[in-house]
């Protein structure tokens, strides 16, 4: 019973941020409970990002958000190593995916090279930088938003990436 009450409390909290989208909220919540990733597709301005951030706040998760543009690099997502002259060693600087809930906003506006940086982390829960594999924090969920194909500056996601999303939710206009 306790889990049911906790799930209802999360749903109620998310519904405060985005009203009238109970089916979408339930779909996303079930995917997250199952350990899956979520793709939210719809036109700009219907609350895709607000909904994703509401889940992060309701669940008190460490979140990270990247607004995908053509100039976002794979290293922005997975991190990079920097040589420290003083110690003579490379030091890893974590990327945006080192969190519990990663929000990839408008994922279909970035290069396919950057999109592919998400493949390992979505499938295996790890990132590999300079030959060193590191786990991301658990639990880990990607909620990505995308605008409809054909909108200015968008491109189709590759099938290999679409396969890593458990569900594709649609927001629709606010009620």
Q: For each predicted feature, which ranges?
A:
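Conserved beta-strand position immediately N-terminal to the Walker
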Residues: 38, 102, 140
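Pre-Walker A (pre-P-loop) alpha-helix and adjacent loop at the N terminus of AAA/AAA+ ATPase modules
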Residues: 2-46
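Walker B catalytic acidic pair
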Residues: 42, 105-106, 117
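Conserved alpha-helical scaffold flanking the Walker A/P-loop in AAA+ ATPase domains
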Residues: 27-30, 83-104
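Canonical AAA+ ATPase core
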Residues: 84-89, 109-114, 122-175
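Conserved P-loop/Walker A NTP-binding site and adjacent catalytic elements of P-loop NTPases
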Residues: 53-83, 87-88, 93
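P-loop (Walker A) phosphate-binding loop of NTP-binding proteins
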Residues: 43, 77, 145
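Walker A/P-loop
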Residues: 29-70
